């Protein structure tokens, strides 16, 4: 049975994709909604899929879109590219309905492609209402009814912390430098002369100043695994 994986370019979904490829055919799905960092995400997704340990079991990427720019205002931080600060609580970076949109569009694709299982990289302690088991169960039921075919929506890492996922990714041979956990990624050419020397192979740099960078940095420390990420600044990392 094929499984569709919502792949965002991030660490959690990348490890999930590699994990699912160990079990059978995996179809990566990327859904664009118009967020400021999506160009960098798409580039990272393409790079990851080209070099990831997927055992030859990955279908070509399904790149889908749902334009949410008429819902989230142009001044919204996620649209304007001005993410909340490094120490912002997770609750304050909520994008209302994001998982509703991602799962809905991916589910329609799954129905067309005759895929009966869709997985998302939700982790433990996610505070958002569209990340709960109750939501996923209700969503799967509604989409199965509406599409006229069964669809299982699963979150295999729902009881795992990001550090646990990093350890799993290391065991699978995932190249973490090919993942992106940043709300304000930048190209090397945009960095200041004072920034650290960068590898010429790197195309996308983590800002080091947003809450996603903090979460990533801290999770590598908790996992006891060296963080291969290049951050534009390191002043806030601890």
Regions found by a protein language model. Give the residues of each.
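ATP-dependent adenylation/nucleotidyltransferase module used to activate substrates
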Residues: 1-173, 191, 198, 202-204
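Short cysteine/histidine-rich metal-coordination sites, predominantly Zn2+-binding motifs
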Residues: 224-235
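Short clusters of hydrophobic/aromatic residues that line enzyme substrate/ligand-binding pockets
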Residues: 71-72, 77-79, 182, 220, ...
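Local cysteine-cluster metal-coordination motifs and their immediate loop/turn environment
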Residues: 104, 178-187, 205-218
